[in-house]
Every structure is written in structure tokens, then in C-alpha cells.
């Protein structure tokens, strides 16, 4: 076990004010992420095949892939706050353009652009959170960050399902408006970070550090497997639910269940998981993530699908806050944005290949897809459990200079 930590409420009260502002902006943005979870359903209703809809999600992932590298670089050079604001404004504009797509080429191009423009804020927000919070508080801070993220995720898809029942156009408009609100929050309330070293302007140092960081490699490899599973939630899960005869609103409710569980239970669960070695906690969580979606192979009722989502969510709540804090502890402050960007690349790979391969596999055999997800969860657990040890406080845990 790791050393004793302060009580949860004391840890939350100790978080600086800008952290709470970042949480609020994250909630706004995620609440309004209406379009992507419903894009496959929207496109199939327009007459596109599931495989074509999967390509659009893959194109979004390709844009997300580029966004991780661009966002990581901008976070370390332009600054965290400006990067967040620029991403939100450009993301809002591309969502409005995506609403006008009617051809496959249009969906592919604009989905890729939306993935780039609307997602390059992520390395900046993760880096800013790590900048503002000392190492001993990072598990709680990242858990609270995810609570804000998932509070939006809990209410957003349910709201989107209601809006979609009236008009899918409102999904695009609402997505754009909430992005603009986050941009305003970033401009007026978030601090400006200044990189501590001039060498932060060059990718060479970051790539050299990453190339020799074996612990980082293990995290990345495990994340690749887990990302494939996670992104079935916004690609094949909706089709699986509707193929069983249930409505898009049912899919929205199942997605919201995931968010509600995280909002109410992840922080209390963190008070337990932060006491144990990080890699061991991550391995248990990853295995449960695989078991949850693996169970979908045998789930045919709403209750069974909800049960599968509950197991998946338990694994998510156990693993992800600890893995986020573990990653933050690995990163040198002046390279933090690019470390976070490279980490994000693995999730983009999962989005690209997870959605495309997942859609293809789903078209041939839904059971094979979900059983593959189960196997990948155990693969990720095996990778991350090697060299089990607690997260240590290293010389990488200094802060960046902050100015307003």
C-alpha cells in the first residue's frame, strides 16, 4: 500500500481555484458533445451503410490523431489557455459545417476536420491540470476532472437523444454553442502557463525523452488495447442496441448510465484505489473493462446491456484516474504537453482502428466483436501489470511558472 493520504473532502478543498474553473469548462464542453455519439445512427438514417458510418468515425479519429500532436506542441509553446480557446472556437465552426454534409466524401472530410479542430485542446487541459496540482493530489484531481467530464457525458447523450427525436440539426447547433462557452471560460478565467525551458519549442527533446522512457511505453501499449474497447461505445454500441430493436434514446440512456455512475462513485472509489500500487490498480480496472464489453456478446435485453455497462464502468473508474495521475508523474514539466499529446495519439489510434475494425467486425459477427473486446481487456492488464510498483515522486514533478 502507498502512504496515508488526506481525506477526500480535504483533498478536494486543497485544489486551486483555476482547477475548478477547468472542471466547469470541461463539463460544458462534454455536455454539448452531442454529435459524435450519434453520428453513426444519423448517417445510417441518411442511407449510408454501417461500414461507411464507421469510416466517418475513423476520419474523426484521424483528425484527433493529428490534433494530439498539434495540441501537445501548442500547449508547450502557445500556452495551455490559448490552445484550449483556439480549439473550442475552431471546433464550433467545424461542427456547423458538418451539419451540412450530405455525401460520404463530405462526411469524411468534415469529420476529420472536426476531429482536428475540436480535440487539440485535450493535451493542453491535461497538462494544465498537472501544472496546477502537486503530485500527491493528482489522483484525486484527475478523478474530479473525470467527474466533470462524465457529468457532462451523463446528461449530454440523454439530452442529445431527446433533441435527435425532434431534429438532428439541433445536435450540431448545441455542440457548437457549448464549445463557444468553454472558449469564453478559458479566456476570462484560466491562468496562462509559461514553459520553464526554451527547449520546449523543439520536438527533438521530447521524442528523445519518450524514446527512452520504458514506463511510458508500457502505458502506451496498454492504452492502445483499452482504447479499442472504449471507442466501441461511440461506434458499434449504438448500432448493437438499435439492431436489437431499441431506440436511439435507449442508447443515449445507456451511455448516460456510464456517466452517472462515474459522477457518483468514482471519487469515493479513488480514496481506496490511490492506496495501492498504480500498475496493479490499472491492471484490475483494465480486466474489468474487457469483461464488461465482452459480456455484450450475451446481452440481448436492456437490463443485460445495462449490467454490461456497469461492469465496464467499474473497470473504468478503477483504472483511468490512477493511469492519468501515473502518466502526469512520468512527464517532465516543460515537455508535458507533448507527452500528453503522444498519449492522446494512442487513443486516436483506438478511435481510428477501433471504429473502422469494430464496424467491419460487427457487420460480420457482433459476438466476435464483443468477445474480442473482452480479450483485449486482459491483454492490457497483462501489459501494465509487468514491473508492478507504486507511483513514485520523481524529479519530473516540478511545476511550470504561472502568470495571469
Describe the role of every protein-language-model region.
Residues 2-16, 191-221, 404:
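Juxtamembrane intracellular "pre-TM" segments in multi-pass secondary transporters
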Residues 12-61, 215-222, 227-254:
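Helix-loop boundary and gating motifs at the non-cytosolic
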Residues 99-110, 297-308:
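Helix-loop junctions at membrane interfaces in 12-TM secondary transporters
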Residues 67-79, 265-277:
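Helix-to-loop junctions at the C-terminal end of transmembrane segments
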Residues 34, 61-69, 153-154, 259-267, ...:
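Residue-level signature of mid-helix packing/kink "hotspots" within the transmembrane helices
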Amino acid at each position: 500500500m502507498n502512504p496515508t493520504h488526506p481525506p477526500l473532502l480535504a483533498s478536494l478543498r486543497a485544489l486551486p481555484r483555476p482547477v475548478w474553473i477547468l472542471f466547469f469548462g470541461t463539463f460544458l464542453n462534454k455536455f454539448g458533445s452531442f454529435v459524435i455519439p450519434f453520428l453513426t445512427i444519423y448517417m445510417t438514417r441518411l442511407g449510408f451503410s454501417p461500414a461507411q458510418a464507421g469510416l466517418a468515425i475513423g476520419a474523426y479519429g484521424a483528425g484527433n490523431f493529428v490534433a494530439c500532436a498539434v495540441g501537445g506542441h501548442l500547449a508547450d509553446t502557445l500556452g495551455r489557455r490559448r490552445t484550449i480557446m483556439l480549439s473550442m472556437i475552431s471546433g464550433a465552426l467545424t461542427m456547423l459545417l458538418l451539419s451540412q454534409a450530405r455525401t460520404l466524401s463530405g462526411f469524411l472530410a468534415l469529420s476529420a476536420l472536426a476531429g482536428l479542430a475540436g480535440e487539440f485542446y485535450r493535451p493542453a487541459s491535461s497538462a494544465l491540470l498537472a501544472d496546477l496540482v502537486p503530485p500527491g493530489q493528482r489522483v484525486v484531481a484527475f478523478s474530479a476532472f473525470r467527474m466533470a467530464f462524465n457529468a457532462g457525458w451523463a446528461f449530454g447523450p440523454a439530452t442529445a437523444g431527446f433533441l435527435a427525436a425532434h431534429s438532428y440539426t439541433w445536435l450540431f447547433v448545441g455542440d457548437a454553442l457549448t464549445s463557444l462557452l468553454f472558449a469564453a471560460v478559458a479566456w476570462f478565467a484560466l491562468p496562462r502557463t509559461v514553459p520553464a525551458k526554451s527547449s520546449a519549442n523543439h520536438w527533438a527533446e521530447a521524442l528523445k525523452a519518450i524514446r527512452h522512457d520504458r514506463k511510458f511505453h508500457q502505458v502506451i501499449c496498454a492504452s492502445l488495447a483499452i482504447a479499442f474497447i472504449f471507442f466501441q461505445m461511440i461506434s458499434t454500441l449504438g448500432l448493437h442496441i438499435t439492431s436489437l430493436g431499441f431506440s436511439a434514446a435507449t442508447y443515449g440512456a445507456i451511455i448516460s448510465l456510464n456517466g452517472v455512475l462515474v459522477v457518483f462513485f468514482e471519487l469515493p472509489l479513488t480514496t481506496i484505489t490511490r492506496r495501492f500500487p498504480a500498475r496493479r490498480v490499472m491492471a484490475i480496472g483494465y480486466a474489468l473493462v474487457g469483461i464488461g464489453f465482452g459480456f455484450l456478446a450475451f446481452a440481448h435485453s436492456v437490463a443485460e446491456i445495462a449490467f454490461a455497462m456497469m461492469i465496464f464502468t467499474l473497470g473504468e473508474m478503477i483504472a483511468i484516474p490512477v493511469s492519468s495521475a501515473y502518466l502526469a508523474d512520468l512527464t517532465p514539466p516543460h515537455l508535458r504537453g507533448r507527452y500528453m499529446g503522444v498519449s492522446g495519439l494512442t487513443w486516436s489510434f483506438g478511435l481510428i482502428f477501433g471504429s473502422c475494425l469494430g464496424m467491419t467486425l460487427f457487420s460480420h459477427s457482433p459476438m466476435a466483436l464483443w468477445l474480442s473486446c473482452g480479450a483485449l481487456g486482459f491483454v492490457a492488464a497483462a501489459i501494465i501489470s509487468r514491473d508492478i510498483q507504486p507511483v513514485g515522486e520523481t524529479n519530473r514533478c516540478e511545476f511550470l511558472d504561472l502568470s495571469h
